[in-house]
């Protein structure tokens, strides 16, 4: 049985809760750090969280949705829905500054600035995330 919200949380509070939901592929990041949460809407007796996956076929999308729903249930939200929004497409530009720092410490340096400017644009990492050396090369566009 689906019941109404036990307590009507504010959207800002839900955003804070989502800071605790890790990305299943890179668990040092929250889904907020990654920038995939696009909107939180509290209306009536339902919370709707809109998510843009990092790519349209992302295999972690179902796990992320379940994790969001579980995080909300733990706080008394009994009616939640996760909506997928594919457009505009996610870019590394959406990663938060805190998320970029966490990735750097984890050994990953995502592209910076105008990531969607075009396929021909390739921004090499600025520095090695481990030692800070400027002698770096891109190893992989994906993962």
Put a short name on every predicted segment.
Residues 1-143:
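Domain-level signature for proteins that mediate thiol-based redox and metal-cofactor handling
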């Amino acid at each position: 049985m689906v019941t109404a919200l036990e307590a009507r949380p504010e959207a800002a509070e839900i955003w804070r809760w989502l800071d605790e939901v890790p990305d299943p592929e890179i668990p040092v990041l929250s889904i907020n750090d990654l920038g995939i949460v696009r909107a939180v809407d509290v209306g009536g007796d339902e919370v709707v969280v809109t998510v843009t996956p990092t790519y349209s076929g992302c295999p972690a999308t179902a796990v992320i949705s379940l994790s969001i729903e579980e995080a909300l249930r733990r706080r008394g939200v009994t009616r939640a829905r996760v909506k997928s929004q594919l457009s505009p497409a996610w870019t590394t530009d959406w990663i938060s500054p805190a998320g970029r720092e966490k990735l750097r410490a984890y050994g990953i340096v995502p592209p910076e600035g105008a990531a969607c400017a075009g396929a021909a644009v390739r921004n090499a990492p600025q520095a090695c995330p481990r030692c800070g050396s400027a002698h770096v090369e891109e190893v992989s566009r994906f993962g």
